[in-house]
A protein has these predicted regions:
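Active-site nucleotide/adenylate-binding loops and adjacent lid/helix of ATP-dependent enzymes
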Residues: 3-8, 86-184, 225
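Conserved N-proximal alpha/beta basic substrate-recognition cap immediately N-terminal to
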Residues: 6-118
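Generic beta-strand structural signal
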Residues: 81, 191-192, 249
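Protein kinase-like catalytic core scaffold
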Residues: 139, 197-198, 243, 256-258
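Phosphate-binding site of ATP-dependent enzymes
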Residues: 148-234, 238
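A short beta-strand motif that forms the metal-chelation/ATP-contact edge
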Residues: 189-191, 253-268
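A long amphipathic alpha-helix within ATP-dependent nucleotide-binding catalytic cores
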Residues: 208-257, 279-291
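A short acidic/glycine-rich loop-to-helix N-cap element
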Residues: 268-274
Length: 291
C-alpha cells in the first residue's frame, strides 16, 4: 500500500506528523511520500482536472487548501480528512452553525457582516452596538480562519472593539461571549476513527488563550461522562475520522465547545498521554482503504 502526505509550504509542526506517520506506516507495510502544496500539484486544463501526483491508495491531507482538496477528490483520490470536513472545521462560524440545535453547548456567537466598501464609515460600525448589547464586555473577537490562537482577541471596551474591527473588517469575523471560568485553560479531546482515544488539559497562566502554540503547559485529563457525551455528539454529527476537539470549561466544569481541528497536531498529546496516535491513525487508514 502506498500513500501521499500533502502539507503547505510552511511545514512547521507538521514535520513531527510526517515523521510519525512514516514510522508507523512502515510497520504496517505502508509506504508514504511527502509533497508540498506549492500551487503546482494540480490544475484544470482543456476542461478537465490534471493532477501532477503519482497514483496512490490515499492522501493524508495536512493542508487547509480546500480548492486542491476538492480537485484531488474529484480526481478520485481518497483524502484523510475529507475536503468537506476540513472546510467545516477551518471556518469557525460554519462549525458553530453545524453544531447549533444539536444539544452542544457553545459560547453565544454573532457572525460579523462582510465588508467590501473601500472606505469604512460610521454607519458600518453600528452593528457593534448590538454586539455589545448581546455579549457585554469583556467579549471575544475571532478571525473565522486561524490556528494556534492567532487572530483571537479579548476585548475589554468599545474603543478596543472599534479599533480591532477597523484593523480586521475585511475578513470574516465572529464575536463571542467570553467564558471567564475557562481563562487560560482548555481541554483537547482527540478522536480517531469515530472514537475518543484520550484527552489532555492545557494551561496558560499568562493569557486567556490556552493554545499550546502560545507556550501553554499540559497534562493528561481523565474524561468524565459529560465530556464524552458531547464528544460523541460531535463524532456523530460530523462523522469524524480524525480531529482534535477543544472544549472550554463552564460553570462546574461544564463542557463548552470552542472549536474542532481537522488537522490537529499530536506531538504534545503523544508525550503527555503515551498514546500512539500515529499508529491508531495509520491503522484506521489501512482498514478504510481495504474496506
Amino acid at each position: 500500500m502506498n500513500g501521499i502526505i500533502i502539507t503547505n509550504q510552511d511545514i512547521g509542526h507538521n514535520a513531527y506528523k510526517i515523521k510519525r506517520f512514516t514510522e508507523e506506516g512502515n510497520k504496517l507495510g505502508i509506504s508514504l511520500s511527502h509533497y508540498i502544496n506549492d500551487g503546482s500539484l494540480a490544475l484544470i486544463k482543456d476542461n478537465n482536472i490534471e493532477v501532477k501526483l503519482p497514483k496512490a491508495d490515499f492522501i493524508i491531507y495536512l493542508d487547509k487548501d480546500i480548492y486542491l482538496a476538492r480537485i484531488l477528490e474529484k480526481a478520485n483520490y481518497r483524502l484523510f480528512n475529507h475536503a468537506d470536513f476540513i472546510k467545516m472545521c477551518d471556518d469557525k462560524m460554519l462549525t458553530n452553525i453545524m453544531c447549533a440545535n444539536s444539544g452542544i453547548k457553545m459560547p453565544k456567537t454573532i457572525a460579523g457582516p462582510l465588508f467590501y466598501s473601500p472606505k469604512l464609515e460610521e454607519k458600518n460600525l453600528k452593528f457593534l452596538d448590538s454586539v455589545i448589547s448581546e455579549l457585554e464586555f469583556p467579549l471575544v473577537m475571532k478571525k473565522v480562519y486561524g490556528s494556534l490562537g492567532l487572530g483571537v482577541y479579548l476585548v475589554n471596551n468599545k474603543e478596543e472593539l472599534i479599533s480591532l474591527y477597523k484593523e480586521n473588517c475585511r475578513q470574516p469575523l465572529q464575536f463571542q461571549e467570553y467564558i471567564a471560568t475557562s481563562f487560560g485553560k482548555s481541554l483537547r479531546v482527540l478522536i480517531i476513527d469515530g472514537k475518543v482515544v484520550g484527552a489532555f488539559q492545557r494551561y496558560n497562566t499568562e493569557d486567556f488563550r490556552s493554545n499550546f502554540g502560545l507556550t501553554a503547559t499540559s497534562k493528561e485529563y481523565p474524561l468524565n461522562d459529560k465530556f464524552l457525551e458531547v464528544a460523541n455528539k460531535i463524532i456523530n454529527l460530523f462523522n469524524v475520522e480524525y480531529a482534535g476537539v477543544d472544549f472550554l470549561f463552564g460553570e462546574n466544569n461544564e463542557p463548552i465547545l470552542c472549536e474542532i481541528n481537522s488537522n490537529a497536531f499530536f506531538e504534545e498529546f503523544e508525550k503527555v498521554t503515551n498514546i500512539n496516535v500515529a499508529r491508531l491513525f495509520m491503522e484506521m487508514v489501512k482498514r478504510k482503504i481495504y474496506e
